[in-house]
């Protein structure tokens, strides 16, 4: 951890309200990029970004300094993103599906399908980037997370492993599989 990070962490521990602003200014673009690559949706990435900084500012005392401040934020963002991906994997139910009134457990669908039109996806013109994004989205979440952190965000294998709470050798195996 460099001197600048130490000063910022001390200010966060003291509850300095400007320290959170500094934290957001310093890391928001990197965290947003990770969240976007994990989810593939700008709106969800923004929500993850907000959740990450809320969690970080409220839980600053939990930061022990064993890693860099950026690595800690990546971990929070990755955990938030993976939780969202897990929620998304719940079965979806079309709105037209008949409801069995006798079986109350099937009365409410677990998750409705999102049919919203996303103009950003439609206007993507770079075919290579689109193909890469599509390929990343098809990866299972455990492989996607390590791939995004190391190969797209530029973290070292060791740093990506720290963020995900796995060993460096496990990260290498996951990268190989991705």
Locate predicted features:
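Helix-turn-helix DNA-binding module
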Residues: 3, 43, 133-170
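Short, charged helix-capping/linker segments at alpha-helix termini
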Residues: 13-22, 32-51, 168
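Amphipathic, Lys/Arg- and hydrophobic-enriched alpha-helical face
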Residues: 24-42, 59, 136, 142
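Residues within the DNA-recognition helix of helix-turn-helix
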Residues: 27, 174-177
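Structural recognition of an alpha-helix C-terminal capping motif at a helix-to-coil junction
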Residues: 33, 47-54, 67-79
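DNA major-groove recognition helix of helix-turn-helix
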Residues: 49, 85, 175
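Arg/Lys-rich amphipathic alpha helix in sigma70-family domain 2
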Residues: 61-65, 78-96
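Acidic, proline/glycine-rich intrinsically disordered inter-domain spacer in sigma factors
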Residues: 101-134
